[in-house]
């Protein structure tokens, strides 16, 4: 029995190495070893009777409903041309500075991550749109391909993210808390990308040139760039956000009719950002409708292109953070919002809906098949005490929490070369989560850390999925540029691989930062005070004892009068000859002390 769990795990690896689909490998391995265990007498015959109930439990999991809604939202936005507009507009904003196109790709990647959340869609969209432009104006090929692949993988860590939804479900934690924990690491990683591009632009200016003047599309009639009005609009929006954040308690007092002294930080942030975005949109809309001429073409373009996706992000994340909606409800509203945006842009039609629904159905079916297979495997694996084997294997690693985290991250890093994040989440995470919890590791921290690790594996050559996505759309033959008429050489696979190396190093630095500074994840979470069971036990033991026994009965209590009935014998409900309580009452008086029972239960729990 002790060797059955490792043999079963090795059997799963053999199934996967033979090339069978992961879902069927999991299910077949679970059924095979389950029936073998029953035949050998290692497992009870009733074990498999629990399988239908577990599968129905999957179907009733409301958290997993967020997956099709989120996928549908991302696909509608991606196919409605939002990425093209964002890249064109932000590219014009940052174009005049060295490295401007690379900065635009990073920021658009972050926005697409917060709206579509699909790595393949982000990488392919930016590869089709921005790579030809970057090659046209002389960007280094390794820098261009690396920044596109790295920015596309931000969809793994920036909320809302499919990876974080599944992590929360498998680790038994709130999706909202997982989103909050991933916010700071996502922004830090984006900042590290920006810092690297800025360093390259300063040290090697020829690798990241600025856009030439003739490539800048949005200019005023007098030839000016239009930046001053954009800066003024941003300043007004910033002032509105600061005002709302500082006076949120006063606003609540005015609305509710009684004094409110404190407002949650999440509410302040969401309300302030929403207010700033709405004010900017109203100013731009009023300027266009009334033809006031207060804003430049660039300022208007930036406002009307950026505001809709930002509002959609606030609709999804804001409602989740404020507790107005569950993650499933928030993402469902996001899908409806994406459809409304596509309608307003005139891009929603039956062809787009069919493509989006078809892709959503395929992904949802893929996830459900893997989850059912993982359920079969985990049922049998738990039956043979597999989790205890994994726990003993990992808790004996040197270094405590840090040693465990380093070993697990190395393992996940290499497994992610061959397995998709869905497969890793359903196979490996349920085995590692209980061990991390036993070691005292915060599971939100653990989940975000593994999500960043999986993001790193998306880019590691030669197995990174993001590199394959980019290779599929990067030019592999020499072609003539339509704008300049120049002959552009092809992008080689080795250029894509070498371009990803600096960003893999940046992501590994981010993993190390999260391991040694968990406050980057847990700092923004609501603090939950843990109960020290030893302190509770000591407190109960030191409390003055209470007498919970029945009070003594008066003499003659319960005895019939001599003139109405014969005396009853003791033991038949009458008092004993000395006037004490009956035997049944004496047994009740000897019952264990409830306080002692609580102490015994706590001691047993600590064991």
Which role fits each region the language model picked out?
Residues 1-607:
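Alpha-helical transmembrane segments of multi-pass membrane transport proteins
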């Amino acid at each position: 029995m002790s060797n059955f769990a490792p043999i079963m795990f090795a059997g799963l690896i053999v199934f996967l190495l033979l090339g069978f689909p992961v879902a069927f490998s999991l299910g077949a391995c679970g059924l095979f070893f389950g029936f073998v265990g029953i035949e050998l007498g290692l497992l009870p015959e009733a074990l498999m009777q629990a399988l239908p109930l577990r599968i129905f439990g999957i179907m009733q999991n409301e958290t997993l409903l967020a997956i099709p809604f989120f996928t549908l939202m991302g696909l509608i936005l991606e196919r409605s041309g939002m990425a093209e507009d964002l890249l064109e507009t932000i590219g014009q904003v940052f174009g005049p500075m060295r490295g401007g196109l690379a900065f635009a790709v990073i920021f658009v990647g972050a926005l697409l991550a917060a709206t579509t959340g699909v790595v393949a869609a982000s990488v392919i969209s930016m590869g089709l749109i921005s790579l030809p432009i970057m090659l046209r104006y002389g960007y280094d090929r390794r820098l261009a391909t690396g920044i596109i692949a790295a920015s596309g993988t931000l969809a793994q860590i920036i909320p809302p993210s499919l990876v974080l939804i599944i992590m929360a479900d498998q680790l038994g934690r709130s999706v909202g808390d997982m989103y909050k924990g991933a916010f700071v690491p996502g922004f830090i990683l984006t900042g590290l990308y920006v810092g690297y591009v800025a360093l390259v632009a300063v040290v090697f200016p020829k690798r990241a040139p600025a856009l030439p003047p003739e490539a800048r599309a949005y200019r005023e009639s007098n030839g000016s760039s239009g930046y001053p009005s954009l800066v003024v609009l941003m300043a007004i929006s910033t002032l509105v956000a600061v005002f709302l954040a500082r006076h949120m308690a006063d606003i609540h007092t005015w609305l509710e009719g009684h004094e409110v002294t404190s407002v949650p930080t999440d509410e302040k942030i969401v309300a302030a950002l929403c207010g700033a975005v709405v004010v900017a949109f109203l100013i731009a809309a009023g300027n266009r409708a009334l033809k006031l001429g207060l804003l430049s073409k660039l300022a208007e373009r930036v406002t009307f292109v950026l505001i809709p996706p930002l509002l959609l992000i606030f609709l999804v994340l804001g409602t989740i953070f404020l507790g107005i909606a569950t993650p499933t409800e928030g993402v469902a509203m996001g899908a409806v919002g994406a459809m409304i945006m596509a309608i307003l842009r005139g891009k929603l039609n039956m062809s787009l809906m069919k493509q989006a629904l078809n892709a959503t159905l395929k992904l949802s079916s893929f996830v459900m098949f893997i989850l059912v297979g993982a359920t079969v495997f985990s049922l049998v694996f738990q039956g043979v005490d597999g989790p205890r084997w994994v726990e003993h294997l990992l808790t004996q690693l040197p270094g405590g929490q840090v040693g465990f985290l380093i070993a697990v991250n190395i393992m996940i890093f290499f497994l992610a070369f061959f397995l998709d994040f869905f497969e890793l989440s359903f196979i490996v995470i349920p085995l590692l989560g209980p061990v991390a919890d036993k070691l005292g590791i915060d599971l939100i921290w653990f989940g975000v850390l593994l999500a960043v690790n999986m993001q790193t594996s998306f880019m590691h050559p030669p197995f990174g999925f993001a590199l394959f996505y980019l290779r599929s759309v990067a030019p592999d033959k020499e072609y003539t540029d339509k704008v300049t008429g120049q002959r552009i050489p092809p992008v080689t696979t080795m250029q894509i691989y070498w371009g990803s190396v600096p960003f893999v190093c940046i992501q590994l630095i981010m993993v190390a930062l999260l391991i040694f500074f968990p406050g980057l994840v847990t700092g923004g979470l609501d603090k939950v005070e843990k109960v020290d069971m030893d302190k509770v036990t000591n407190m109960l033991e030191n409390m003055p004892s209470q007498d919970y026994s029945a009070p003594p009965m008066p003499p003659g209590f319960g005895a019939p009068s001599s003139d109405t009935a014969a005396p009853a014998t003791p033991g038949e409900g009458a008092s004993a000859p000395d006037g004490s309580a009956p035997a049944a009452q004496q047994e009740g008086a000897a019952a264990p002390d409830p306080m002692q029972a609580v102490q015994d239960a706590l001691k047993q729990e600590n064991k």
